[in-house]
A protein has these predicted regions:
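Non-catalytic, polymerase-adjacent accessory regions of viral genome-replication enzymes
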Residues: 1-44, 48
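Catalytic phosphate-handling regions of large nucleic-acid enzymes and associated NTPases
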Residues: 61, 70, 104, 111-130
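Conserved catalytic palm subdomain of right-hand nucleotidyl-transferase polymerases, strongest
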Residues: 28-35, 80, 119-142
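Phosphate/adenylate-binding "loop-and-lid" substructures adjacent to NTP/NAD/dNTP-binding pockets
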Residues: 33-70
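Conserved, non-catalytic sequence blocks in retroelement Pol enzymes and Pol-derived host proteins
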Residues: 38, 81-84, 111-116
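Short, compositionally biased low-complexity segments
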Residues: 11-27, 64-66, 95-100, 130
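Conserved pre-motif C helix in the palm subdomain of viral-like polymerases
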Residues: 76-105, 141
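Hydrophobic face of alpha-helices
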Residues: 40, 47, 89-90, 94, ...
């Protein structure tokens, strides 16, 4: 592997591990209509195709399936459902980048972080509100 052109090596084993994580999460078929069970019927070829495209730098994600779900407050929210294949590719990226980036994130960052939730952010905010009796408010204009 030439490290100057490929900063991350993607092994076939990593793609397989990513698939098992995606399978455990279940999920609906994407725009291609392929379920996890259908994907698994041709697992070896499907995983090889993902690995080959990602390793060669020519992976391009397919479109997502738009699904509208109702909001509790009224109205609708549009969700984008990726294909099983794209979920595996996304998981590969997550598994490579998360251990590298997690240590450099700010300790006050809670969104989409492992072991952190919005409830954790609320608890820290509540604690800080009780510890301080002042607020700094400002607006930045260009």
């Amino acid at each position: 592997m030439n490290s100057s052109t490929k900063p991350f090596e993607i092994s076939k084993q990593l793609v397989l591990q990513a698939y098992y994580k995606v399978k455990a999460n279940k999920g609906s078929p994407g725009i291609d209509g392929e379920s996890i069970e259908m994907f698994e019927a041709n697992l070896k070829n499907n995983l090889y195709r993902i690995w080959n495209r990602m390793s060669s730098g020519c992976y391009f994600p397919p479109s997502v399936k738009a699904v509208c779900i109702p909001k509790k407050s009224g109205g609708m929210r549009v969700l984008g459902i990726p294909t099983v294949s794209d979920r595996v590719a996304q998981m590969v990226v997550k598994m490579v980048l998360e251990p590298i980036l997690e240590p450099v994130f700010d300790e006050d960052s809670y969104g989409y972080r492992p072991g952190r939730s919005s409830h954790d952010a609320i608890a820290v905010t509540r604690k800080r509100c009780w510890n301080y009796d002042w607020v700094v408010e400002f607006d930045v204009k260009v």
